[in-house]
């Protein structure tokens, strides 16, 4: 049996909390993506009132586990897993809120983009640095980012690999709210409960 890298808590207020728990950087390994897809499909089959996805106190998700990219075939396989998992998150028939503390980079940013709303802490930063590895975002990020911030800003972020901090993310429409790190989870839960 594989290690549980994602925990789900269904609260009495109708909110389901999905917690990423894959080590220090919350990398989205192939096993995390499989578990995320399974969790999202379960939340679609038996939906709660709303969903909050959280990482750790210091990092939302660092993106793909690049140690798994041993060649083009593995990269394609992981790309498919990303697309399947993030599409499953986007398909949850309730409001899904990403509570973003610290970096949400690469696939971590794409996970936040697959959510309906993004509440972030003042220390959050978003970015699609895949171009620096010679690849482009493969989990739906090119489309979802453009829908949120417009095609021109999306091209800037995707083609440069530039990262944006919380205040800029709020200004350009990538984040919906910015709160202190201490308030992040409680604010995301409060917002989710208002939809539940």
Feature roles, as predicted:
Residues 18, 53, 65, 111-113, ...:
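Hydrophobic/aromatic residues within transmembrane alpha-helices
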Residues 32-35, 55-88, 104, 132-134:
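Glycine- (often His-adjacent) and acidic-residue-rich active-site loop
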Residues 143-152:
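Hydrophobic, secondary-structure "cap" segments at the distal end of domains
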Residues 151-155, 164-171:
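Short, structured loop/turn "capping" segments at alpha-beta junctions
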């Amino acid at each position: 049996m594989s290690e549980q890298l994602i925990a789900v808590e269904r609260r009495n207020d109708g909110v389901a909390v999905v917690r990423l728990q894959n080590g220090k950087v919350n990398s989205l390994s192939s096993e995390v993506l499989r578990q995320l897809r399974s969790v999202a499909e379960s939340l679609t089959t038996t939906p709660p009132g709303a969903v909050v996805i959280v990482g750790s106190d210091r990092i939302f998700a660092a993106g793909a586990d690049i140690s798994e990219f041993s060649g083009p075939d593995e990269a394609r396989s992981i790309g498919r897993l990303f697309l399947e998992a993030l599409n499953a998150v986007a398909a949850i028939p309730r409001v899904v809120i990403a509570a973003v503390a610290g970096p949400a980079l690469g696939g971590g940013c794409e996970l936040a983009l697959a959510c309906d709303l993004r509440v972030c802490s003042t220390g959050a930063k978003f970015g699609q640095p895949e171009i620096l590895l010679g690849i482009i975002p493969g989990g739906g990020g090119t489309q979802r980012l453009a829908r949120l911030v417009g095609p021109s800003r999306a091209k800037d972020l995707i083609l440069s690999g530039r990262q944006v901090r919380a205040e800029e993310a709020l200004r350009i429409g990538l984040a919906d709210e910015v709160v202190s790190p201490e308030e992040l989870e409680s604010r995301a839960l409060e917002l989710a409960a208002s939809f539940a």
